[in-house]
Amino acid sequence: TAYEIVSRDWSSDVCSSDLEDATQPTKHDFGKDIIPSLIHKVPVYAYRFYDENKKASKYWRDVGTLDAYFEANMDLCGVTPEFNLYDPEWPLRTYQPQAPPAKFVFAEQGRRCGQALDSVISPGCIVSGSTINGSVLCPNVRVHSFCEIDQSILMPGVRVGRHARIRRAIIDRDVLVPRGAVIGYYSDEDRRRHTVTDGGVVVVTANDEPYIAPIDERALAAELA
């Protein structure tokens, strides 16, 4: 994303004139409309986003669409992502939640094994006998047993019930994914129940009702054994 730094007095004048011009056919976007119109009127400066030591541009990604946001997060799960969260030369200045470390429980033979592969798991998360693959779990997410989470983003406070399967999805904050829910596997059901991006990413909000798969009696018996 992009940031513009302006003085309060200057921004008041600019915003006022932009509001007066609101009937004009523009999106009133800082980068596309407002700044270009000001270049010949007032001093405008750009920060050269370049690493002189490495002789390369620093990381920048436009996340103005859901697909772009999704791909930027998926890139973090790679072995050598373009944006390295662990680079001591570029620390993140952000709020750190007061939460315990992530925890993975159950190591039984078969499906009930709490594990995460090629994923970013935030503090406060508990993965209870489920597999997380290529996904980003935000703080305080709880995934109950026998779930499969693949290439997905789970926002803070999400709860996932047992036997749920989620693939290529963004689950909104504090959503309770019900037991047996299937998200990202059946395109017709996904489009009928959720928002689906042009890139095929399923976006699930608190008001959605995910498709529930029929209960596998053998799996249920094994769970209760």
Report residues per predicted region:
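Left-handed beta-helix
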Residues: 20-225
